[in-house]
A protein has these predicted regions:
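Exported/periplasmic ABC-transporter solute-binding proteins
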Residues: 1-172
Length: 172
């Protein structure tokens, strides 16, 4: 019914603007521990993640970490808003959030999935045209016994009006 892009965000004072998928994997698995290892200041990296029960957690693990485990001691947050707040208040912080949650309190990172040849800004346009790599489809599952009750909603959400609502709430 829609697509969701995940943006990697850091504290606004962080000088790092670009990271490769491999560097992100290193950061979130604990192999890279200091920003100086990726071109930043000599500062400890503080990584934030969603809780293990979150679909966002699983998707980031599959897409970015290539199913490697998150580092021990990663700071798990119950909601995206908590990641935004924590990253905005912690100079060495990094986390990932849905594209719709980006605001001026955090700095989005440009990401490369081609070993650093091309870095792409997380934006609705880049996600929609598939230039930005961290994008997942969103599905609506229902029991077929309830199809009569659910079909009007599915028809609406797939209509032009429904898709406008999807975009308005931050999905693609």
């Amino acid at each position: 019914i829609a697509y969701d892009a995940l943006a990697v965000v850091v504290h606004p004072s962080n000088k790092v603007s670009n990271l490769t998928r491999e560097q992100l994997e290193g950061i979130f698995t604990g192999k890279i521990k200091n920003w100086k290892e990726v071109g930043g200041a000599d500062m400890k990296i503080v990584a934030y993640s969603r809780e293990t029960s979150s679909g966002t957690y699983e998707f980031f693990k599959e897409s970015v970490l290539k199913n490697k485990n998150y580092m021990n001691g990663i700071l798990s947050m119950p909601a995206t808003g908590a990641i935004i707040q924590s990253v905005s208040q912690t100079k060495g912080a990094i986390g990932y959030v849905g594209l719709a949650y980006i605001n001026k309190e955090v700095k989005p990172i440009h990401v490369s999935y081609d070993a650093g040849k091309t870095f792409t800004e997380p934006s609705f346009e880049n996600a929609k045209n598939k230039a930005y790599p961290i994008v997942r489809p969103l599905f609506y599952y229902y029991d077929v016994k309830n199809e009569g009750k659910v079909k009007p909603f599915i028809d609406y959400i797939l209509s032009a009006e429904g898709q406008a609502t999807v975009k308005q709430v931050g999905y693609i």
